[in-house]
Amino acid sequence: MERSKIRNFSIIAHIDHGKSTLADRLLETTGALSDREKTNQFLDKLDLERERGITIKAQAVRLKYRAEDGQDYILNLIDTPGHVDFSYEVSRSLAACEGGMLVVDASQGVEAQTLANVYLAIDQNLEVFPVLNKVDLPGAEPARIKEEIEEIIGLDASDAVEASAKEGIGIHEILESIVEKVPAPKGDADAPLKALIFDSWYDSYQGVIMLVRIFDGTLKKGDKIQLMASKRSYEVLKIGAFSPHPVEFSEMAAGEVGFVIAGIKVLQDAKVGDTVTHLHRPAENPLAGFQEVKPMVYSGLYPIDSGDYDALRDAMEKLRLNDSSFSFEPENSLALGFGFRCGFLGLLHMEIIQERLEREFNMELITTAPTVRYRVITTKGEELIVDSANKLPELQYIDQILEPFIVASIHVPNDYVGGVLALCEEKRGIQREIKYLTSNRVMVVYELPLNEIVLDFYDRLKTVSRGYASLDYEFLDYRPSDLVRLNILVNAETVDALSLIVHRDKSQMRGRELVAKMKEFIPRQQYEVAVQAAIGNKVVARANVKALRKDVTAKCYGGDITRKRKLLEKQKEGKKRMKQVGNVELPQEAFLAILKVKE
């Protein structure tokens, strides 16, 4: 295939702006899908992707299209995830393209994540052109949204295609503008091989399948290849492309996009962003932009039935085959038994992994409150990395604790700015700027501690803005903070699974909330149970779960008061003894209460 006839493009859109439906229409119009395969969201292969309406893994589809100039073109659609947790995957998918189609909902306008992804695309020097989707909706205002795109992003939207993926309007015009506006790929087919892995997943029959974009050189079946970051070498067994069903080729040259299967057994060898080159004629430098993806959020996952521990480990191993950014290590807790400490890219990633474990592997799980990675400098001058409250040393050994900060940009309609500002201030935010994008939309930029975001920030942001605010964030740096460990004691015993790391100013309030919540969920015992929140030895909040009382004097009719007194004294003795040896069973709800303490 000659290079001038190839177009590599991706679709950039916010969640729910109709990206996957649009991709379906492009597949149908170019004849890639037969009638019986027209499922909605054909590219979203995981059930969870369809259900939540989000794209998690990247996909690449090769479409054949005969344009109005009578020439046959090959269009490679590279589908990207749209969520902030997966921004590294997005940047790699965009690096594989020359053009980006910015899809904006004609009734909603530009959102924060769209903006973040557009800037990623512009940084990679992509040719970005706008398309308005959902113009058939009664609330659509194409003219206003075009102005908004020009004002906020600075793209010329005067000739933007007005389309409706659902009704099939404007699909032909979109295909024509891809051919016209997206530049043909550059590259030298005779240079040493350089190919970018922009996604990889594990297939139980063929090993790891890599999606690659070839920048220089030619790749043939049977070639010996080397992965430059992991330094491993393999022999190519199959190459081909999805259109959208797999079609095998004997070779692929510079500018093309396709899949490579090389009998790789571990996903960790074929990391997203790595460069593939020939073993015997390697490229001098890898392609720029490769990063090791680091988890930002940590949480403990425990099986409800401790007999499921091995099954849970197997399930996690399987998920890790398909998701190299998910990491876990065994840990145990007195309250919950054996489980795993897991690292995730963000909250959505955490929810998805949990849901996939519950759904695909029928696991029943308890999750502990999410935390972030702190750096602790001890009095001896050592630096520790702490990702759970139980690993924090005692107060007297700590010199300072540093916590990760992020910079968050929040897009919100004018009417709700006050609520958003109040929320950011409450979460210990530092205001950077407030920018009026249009007469009605505001961009608020704050520096916030990641610790405050992982618990419930996103839900509360949606609440104060009635669902209109959109959030995008990136990691900033580590800063010293006055943080302490808050322990929850039930019956004077610390429950390790409920410990939290909080800011000292908030510790008392947080302690009170937790204790009040715990009091609701602990079943009443025969004796009084004290629930306390403590920092070190200092108790900051307390609540009592009242005792159940059996009426021991019921059998006495009249008679002497001493008889009744004797029975009551005996009961009191029994309760005292019971309290010394008694154990309080904590129900599952108590752990979940900690997660949702704000509601």
Curated annotation (Swiss-Prot):
Classify the protein's membrane topology as the record does. Peripheral membrane protein
Q: Which residues form the tr-type G domain?
A: 4-186
Q: Which UniProt keywords apply?
A: Cell inner membrane, Cell membrane, GTP-binding, Hydrolase, Membrane, Nucleotide-binding, Protein biosynthesis
Which amino acids does the record list as binding GTP? 16-21, 133-136
* Keyword Nucleotide-binding tagged: yes
Q: Which reaction does it catalyse?
A: GTP + H2O = GDP + phosphate + H(+)
Spell out the family assignment given in the record's similarity comment. Belongs to the TRAFAC class translation factor GTPase superfamily. Classic translation factor GTPase family. LepA subfamily.
Q: Which HAMAP family match?
A: LepA
**What name does the UniProt record give this protein?**
Elongation factor 4
